[in-house]
């Protein structure tokens, strides 16, 4: 890449993105720092259990301050891009709607797919930057044989973020740099220290950025209250897969597939949530074996390594961020739908989550489990 070109660095205020900026600056690139302001932590801080205003991850004022301080240290221009309205529309509201209907959403993927990369590239273009660079642990390069950009798993498997990036387009991949793709997290912290960044020991972000305490149930209650609404009545029956009513629950949003605790039913053997039937307000429970399945369907597919799925393909399929990819066969069942058949049964396949498909290190594509 021509070092006279300008790169916009997405700066979250964390170690990873700050190190990316320091690395590229040291290599002689022209840089501009950009922070996406997505959520005002003060909005719900008055609600019980949400802590002091401004406390949080990724969206807090502390993180903006840290990003600005790094930009000043590196002597690069820095801008904050306010996208709170779009974030609420495209990420927060779908998150709330999904939980209330019995699905378990992934807001980080929604944010990457529908907002973050799109807006970063738009802003970069407006300020004269040809590419963006982020602190994600992933790799990308152009495959001359297929004529397509590829997204690949990083060197540090423990930090692999490709699961959340399956929605990236060819245009986005062609204009994005992932400088940390060949590094491990300890190496990144050491690089940050060597570059004189005071935040080299800053803890990693763990929570959903707009739910800093991790309690999504309190968030739902607080957010709906702010909107002048209240939690809808989604209470209903606890039933077995055969239809036997074994109890009642106070709201379908309190459960997710695979959950064992908090069912309120005493039996001779452990029970787990097998399925959530939002239309009937039923929580289906059963034993652990009933959580196992060999098949799933996914919709709203995004293909990366291939332009489309012309015939059945052998892949490794990943059904949640911490899930070890498992051998499976995929085949199209509709214009935007695939059937994934695993060699071995997988536990707790959850509607609302993503399934991401791999050919070795290469992300073939991904979609939303239905």
UniProtKB/Swiss-Prot annotation:
* Sites annotated Interaction with tRNA: 136, 353
Q: Where would you find this protein in the cell?
A: Cytoplasm
* Catalytic activity from the UniProt record: S-sulfanyl-L-cysteinyl-[protein] + uridine(34) in tRNA + AH2 + ATP = 2-thiouridine(34) in tRNA + L-cysteinyl-[protein] + A + AMP + diphosphate + H(+)
Q: Name one Pfam family in it.
A: tRNA_Me_trans
For the biological process aspect of GO, one term held by this record is: tRNA wobble position uridine thiolation
Q: Which UniProt keywords apply?
A: ATP-binding, Cytoplasm, Disulfide bond, Nucleotide-binding, RNA-binding, Transferase, tRNA processing, tRNA-binding
Main location group: cytoplasm
Q: Name one GO molecular function term.
A: ATP binding
Q: Does the keyword Cytoplasm apply?
A: yes
Disulfide bonding pattern of the chain: 111-209
Q: Which GO terms describe its cellular component?
A: cytoplasm
User: Known EC number(s)?
Assistant: 2.8.1.13
Active-site residues, record numbering mapped to chain: 111 (nucleophile), 209 (cysteine persulfide intermediate)
- Record region (Interaction with tRNA): 159-161
Q: Please tell me which top-level EC class this enzyme sits in.
A: transferase
Residues noted as binding ATP in the record, renumbered to the chain: 10-17, 36, 135
Provide the family line.
Belongs to the MnmA/TRMU family.
Q: Please explain the role this protein plays, according to its UniProt record.
A: Catalyzes the 2-thiolation of uridine at the wobble position (U34) of tRNA, leading to the formation of s(2)U34.
Q: Which NCBIfam families match?
A: PRK00143.1, trmU
How is this protein named in the record? tRNA-specific 2-thiouridylase MnmA
| Gene name linked to the record | mnmA
